[in-house]
Design a protein with these regions (language model features):
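Extracytoplasmic/lumenal ectodomains and periplasmic regions of secretory and membrane proteins
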Residues: 71-119
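Selective detector of the "anchor" transmembrane alpha-helix that sits immediately C-terminal
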Residues: 139-163
């Protein structure tokens, strides 16, 4: 292979690695939603909407992180619990415990509307966050499509270069033939 061809092929391979690395980072990103937090009014019932990207109906990886702290005395223990209920009123996730027990529950749930019901004793602060990884279900498809698109661009670029080179060569031949006939 010519040195120029090796360099060109190497650059396309580097581009393929860069595209897939960027997509891997995008697909791993989480969208965080504050459900209840310190300094905000506590809402015992929160609507939670899980939306898929690009019309996918695949289950979305989620994580609900909760922490309950007693307002008067952080070392004091009080009861706390929460339930995540889907549109058909079925409990899909739940947790029960006491204050000062931070917990993170992970699950994969289908897109849809959910309700988070939280029950706490008086003078308890609820800190609840929902993290969704919306691109995770289509991560593999994204890698395949982006890789195929990059390969198509690489072959298209190569074909375009060859086409232009042939056109220039044909034009030069026609010009040299017309000069000979003059």
């Amino acid at each position: 292979m010519e040195r120029k061809q090796i360099l060109n092929l190497s650059l396309w391979i580097v581009a393929l690695l860069i595209i897939n690395t960027i997509w891997a980072n995008v697909a791993a990103n989480e969208a965080s939603q504050q459900l209840n937090d310190q300094g905000f009014e506590f809402q015992p019932e929160r609507q939670v909407s899980l939306k898929a990207v690009f019309g996918s109906d695949a289950e979305l990886p989620i994580a609900i992180t909760t922490e309950f702290i007693h307002r008067d005395d952080p070392s004091r223990s009080a009861n706390a619990s929460w339930r995540l209920i889907d549109a058909s009123n079925e409990v899909v996730l739940n947790w029960a415990g006491s204050t000062n027990e931070p917990a993170t529950l992970k699950a994969e749930l289908p897109p849809g509307e959910y309700t988070l019901n939280t029950t706490i004793d008086e003078n308890v602060i609820a800190i609840q966050h929902l993290d969704i990884t919306p691109f995770a279900p289509i991560a593999t498809l994204g890698h395949v499509l982006l890789s195929l698109l990059l390969v198509a661009i690489a072959f298209g670029e190569s074909a375009t270069r060859n086409f232009i080179a042939k056109r220039i060569e044909q034009t030069e031949i026609k010009e040299s033939l017309s000069l000979i006939h003059i």
